[in-house]
Swiss-Prot record:
This reaction introduces a second double bond into the aromatic ring system. InterPro entries: Chorismate_synth (IPR000453), Chorismate_synth_AroC_sf (IPR035904), Chorismate_synthase_CS (IPR020541). Its cofactor is FMNH2. It comes from Polynucleobacter asymbioticus (strain DSM 18221 / CIP 109841 / QLW-P1DMWA-1) (Polynucleobacter necessarius subsp. asymbioticus). One of its GO terms (molecular function) is chorismate synthase activity. This is Chorismate synthase.
Length: 371
């Protein structure tokens, strides 16, 4: 099985399965000399881990990260950094009934016909459990980007099922299990999820993620554009079915006189481009949104076939997220951080000595509201 590595200079290779003894990542290309401890990584893992509210899977995993290599006396050495997260709450018996069947919407059918053999326990390699080492690896990238450029990341839920979640203030994001930047809508979201669970069904979500203080010049035309690599990474998140950069699909209904972001000596007037121009970062805030499909593992009976091609009815058991989007915010932040880290090192390698007499304009004009 290939396709387990992301990045060119800053690479992350994940390993493990949902119900194996452990999952983890090997991070290669991290510059030496950065202070790094397990505590630096754990905070983001705690934001992603399961069992944190009644609205997500009740699988209890502490997701405690162990640094196995690449750090000596509290500093990165430049060697590959090995990260390990042990699985402690597997219930593989919940998946005995699906060994010979295919769950609608899951990777079961495609994995079976690609590999001829699959691990059905919790989805095996296709499980969202494998996003934990991605988040762990990205904590390293976030730290380096913060120290060198002041880059900051935050994400939030923009929509849960049919309910749009208007942005109110990012201070609310850490105050609720939905990562919603709106405190007033939480009771409605909780009621919606309670009804969804009673119905044995699931829903999708829209997640917004932002990065500020991104240096100008990240991205490589033509086929390694920054936004192209962001989309590639975001589509690597389980259940993601769509990616938008900036105005995204709203660009279709915009006119050029509106969509083009005017430049002024005191800054950009708007940010429909989402922080990239020609696939290269403009210095503006990077704005990305992802669409996450409804969870495929539901209690509602669904039609399917078994491995012999015979018709069956599937009613999924086990512990599952009724909306995987609820825990997706730190994962989306992680993917964005990994792409930026990789491109930052690539830009530094090729264009690190480029100097211009005229400094760049500010990311936004004073007092402007960039929507």
């Amino acid at each position: 099985m290939s396709g387990n590595t992301l990045g060119l200079l800053f690479t992350v290779t994940t390993f493990g399965e949902s119900h194996g003894p452990a999952i983890g990542a090997v991070v290669d290309g991290c510059p030496p000399g950065m202070t790094l401890s397990e505590a630096d990584i754990q905070a983001d893992l705690d934001r992603r881990k399961p069992g944190t509210s009644r609205h997500v899977t009740q699988r209890k995993e502490e997701d405690k990260v162990e640094i196995l290599s690449g750090v000596f006396e509290g500093k990165t050495t430049g060697a590959p950094i090995g990260l390990l997260i042990r699985n402690t709450d597997q219930r593989s018996q919940d998946y005995g009934d699906i060994l010979q069947t295919f769950r609608p919407g899951h990777a079961d059918y495609a994995y079976h016909y690609k590999y001829g053999f699959r691990d059905p326990r919790g989805g095996g390699r296709s499980s969202a459990r494998l996003t934990a080492p991605v988040v762990a690896a990205a904590a390293i990238a976030k730290k380096w980007l913060k120290e060198h450029y002041g880059t900051e990341f935050y994400g939030y839920m923009g929509q849960l099922g049919e309910i749009e979640v208007p942005f109110q203030d990012k201070k609310h994001i850490a105050e609720n299990p939905f990562f919603a930047a709106n405190s007033e809508i939480i009771p409605q979201l909780e009621g919606y999820m309670d009804e969804l669970r009673k119905a044995g069904d699931s829903c999708g979500a829209r997640i917004e993620v932002r990065a500020s203080n991104v240096p100008i010049g990240l991205g490589e035309p033509l086929f390694d554009k920054l936004d192209a690599d962001i989309a590639h990474a975001m589509m690597g998140i389980n259940a993601v079915k769509g990616v938008e950069i900036g105005a995204g699909f709203k660009s279709v209904s915009q006119r050029g006189s509106v969509h083009g972001d005017d430049l002024h000596p005191d800054g950009f007037a708007s940010n429909n481009s989402g922080g990239t121009l020609g696939g290269i970062s403009s210095g503006q805030e990077l704005r990305v949104a992802i669409a996450i499909k409804p969870t495929s593992s539901i209690m509602t009976p669904k039609h399917s076939v078994d491995i012999k091609g015979q018709p069956i009815t599937v009613q999924t058991k086990g512990r599952h997220d009724p909306c995987v989007g609820i825990r997706a915010t730190p994962i989306a932040e992680a993917m964005l951080a990994l792409v930026l880290m990789d491109h930052a090192l690539r830009h530094r390698a090729q264009c690190g000595d480029v100097e211009l007499a005229v400094p760049p304009i500010p990311a936004s004009r004073p007092g402007s509201q960039l929507d």
